[in-house]
Every structure is written in C-alpha cells, then in structure tokens.
Regions:
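Short, high-confidence coil segments that cap the C-terminus of an alpha-helix
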Residues: 46, 92-94, 121-125
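A short acidic, helix-capping loop that chelates divalent metal ions and anchors anionic groups
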Residues: 13-18, 136-137, 204, 242-243
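Hydrophobic/aromatic residues located in beta-strands of well-ordered beta-sheets
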Residues: 5, 48-51, 97, 125, ...
Length: 270
C-alpha cells in the first residue's frame, strides 16, 4: 500500500502571516517539518512526502532546498482539503494520506511511522496521543489560563477509538488527589494534531459540511465522529521538544529556548 505524507503550508495567517518561512534557530519552519516528513518517507516502504502550498514564496523556498512541493488552490478551507488536492496533483495512486501540519516541526519521525502502521493494520483514520503525567497536566492547566483554546484532550474507549475530542480538559477528575497517589500518569490523554486517512475516507471527509460540534469546538476531527467514522488512537511517547505547534511569533522564542535545552532535532545543513 502506498502512503503520502502531506505538509500543508499556507502563507496567510491572521495571527502569524508568513509563518511557514519563519526561522527557528536559523531554519525555516516549513523546512523543518518537511525534513521530518522526508525522513519518515525514507524509513518506510512505498512512502513519499510533499509540501502543499498556495504561495509562490513558499514553493520557491522549498525548491531552493530540494524539497518536494506542489501548488494547491488558495481557497482550500482546511489542511485536509489541501492534503487531498496534493494527492490529486502529486500521487493519484496513493492509498494512505498523512496530514502533517506545517506548524508542527518537532513531530518525531516515530509518530508518523506509528500512524502509517495503524493504517496498514486496517484503521480508517488514525491519530496519535500521549497520556499526560501529572506535571504535564499541571502545565497544560496553567497554559489554558493564558490561552484557553490551546491543547486538545481526547477520550478513548476500550477499543482504542476516540469517543470525544475537546479543547476543554476531559474527563473531569473527581478524587484527583487519590488518583495522583495511585499512578505517576494522569487519566488525561492529550491529542496530537496529526492525522492518517485511507484515501476514500479523506475524500468523504472533505465532502461533508462542517458538523455541529466541530463548529462549537473548532476541531475538524469531530466531523469524523459525528459521521460515525471510527478514529483509531495510537499512543506515542511525548516528544523530546513538546510544543502545541507554532501559532504566534512568541512561540518561536519558546521553541528556540527548548532547543537550547534539549538540542536541535533538525537533520541537515543549517
């Protein structure tokens, strides 16, 4: 089965225009994310990657560094729509599509590999999560005091499929102190915004209108649940550099501070 990792990279952003070209420790964000996709594709059989953009500046930047890139329609409403457009332009014989968000430059290669493995094992849609330690949960709660819509939680059933995604921290924890004494891990699962689709499921997904809870939460994956598509959840280890993505210029400084502590995962000439 053939897989394609798509990195949607849109120039326009209300909070951070030109974000894909922003430098993090001297390397552009789109180049960092494409590097992750490229390394994952090189590790797997029958796998390729491509950057999908609507902007000539981003395309030229990718070409300068030898990165695969295609131009997609500027009116694509979501990264999933852009990913599907990339498949139709770049690799129509694709079976599985991985949507690696362009503002997630610190995604571990192992996470992408785990998602493609789940698709090969029969998942219609697969997405990763980490189970939070109590200290990580405390940090998430503090973060949400400043930015309430940062970070997404997922409820997972016994079949390892998603029951609900929310920008609230779910589930609520009654008797939390006792839970803290029982385990170093909290019951909270934090969703990582990476999606793997069977191509036919992605085609159906983008054809459906925005769903009720998707609109309320601002989470497009809820469209899948509201249309009865099972979403397999794949547990992964927390990344060495843990960020929610790069959404503002201030996030660049935070990312560079983390690089200074943990080292730079980028593989390639600066």
């Amino acid at each position: 089965m053939k897989s394609l990792i798509v990195v949607p990279a849109r120039y326009g952003s209300t909070r951070f225009a030109g974000k894909p070209l922003a430098l993090i420790n001297g390397v552009s964000m789109v180049r960092r994310t494409a590097n992750v996709a490229q390394r994952a594709a090189q590790t797997l059989d029958n796998c390729d990657y491509v950057v999908a953009t609507d902007d000539n500046r981003i395309a030229a930047h990718c070409q300068k560094y030898g990165l695969s890139v295609v131009m997609t329609p500027p009116d694509s409403p979501t990264g999933s729509d852009r990913a599907l457009s990339a498949v139709k332009i770049y690799a129509q014989d694709t079976d599985f599509v991985v949507n690696l968000q362009g503002d997630a430059p610190f995604t571990p290669v192992s996470t992408i590999i785990a998602i493609i493995k789940a698709l090969n094992e029969g998942a219609q849609v697969a997405t990763p999560y980490t189970q939070l330690s109590w200290s990580a949960l405390d940090k998430l709660r503090e973060q949400k005091r400043q930015t309430p819509f940062s970070g997404t939680s997922v409820l997972i059933g016994q079949d390892n499929r998603a029951l609900m995604f929310s920008k609230n921290i779910i589930p609520a924890l009654r008797g939390e102190q006792a839970l803290r004494e029982q385990s170093p891990l909290s019951p909270i699962c934090r969703h990582i915004g990476l999606y793997g689709y069977r191509l036919d499921v992605l085609e159906r997904f983008v054809s459906w209108p925005e769903s009720h809870y998707e609109r309320l939460e601002g989470l497009e994956q809820l469209r899948l649940l509201e249309n009865d598509v099972p979403v397999d959840c794949v547990r992964v280890e927390p990344p060495r550099i843990a960020t929610s993505g790069i959404d503002t210029p201030e996030d660049i400084a935070r990312a560079e501070a983390l690089i200074a502590v943990h080292g730079d995962p980028f593989e390639g000439p600066i």
